[in-house]
Each structure stands twice: as C-alpha cells, then as structure tokens.
C-alpha cells in the first residue's frame, strides 16, 4: 500500500510544484 502511495505522490509532485511556482510568479 505504501509503495503505491509513493508512486501516486511521485506522479502528483511535479504538478503540485508547477502550480506552486506559477503562484509565486
């Protein structure tokens, strides 16, 4: 279960970081 959660997090992380960077600009 934890492994699947990490895989999902790895997929979502780039998009979350992208949105955060857009808000800063």
Swiss-Prot record:
The keyword Mitochondrion does not apply. Expressed by the venom gland. One of its GO terms (cellular component) is extracellular region. It comes from the Eukaryota. Keywords: Antibiotic, Antimicrobial, Cytolysis, Hemolysis, Membrane, Secreted, Target cell membrane, Target membrane, Toxin. It is found in: Secreted; Target cell membrane. One of its GO terms (molecular function) is toxin activity. Belongs to the non-disulfide-bridged peptide (NDBP) superfamily. Medium-length antimicrobial peptide (group 3) family. Ponericin-W subfamily. Membrane-perturbating peptide with multiple activities. It is insecticidal, since it induces reversible paralysis in insects (L.cuprina) after 1 hour, but fails to kill flies. It shows a relatively strong and broad-spectrum antibacterial activity against both Gram-positive and Gram-negative bacteria (MIC<20 uM). It is also anthelmintic, since it potently inhibits the larval development of the major pathogenic nematode of ruminants (H.contortus, IC(50)=2.8 uM). This is M-poneritoxin-Na1b.
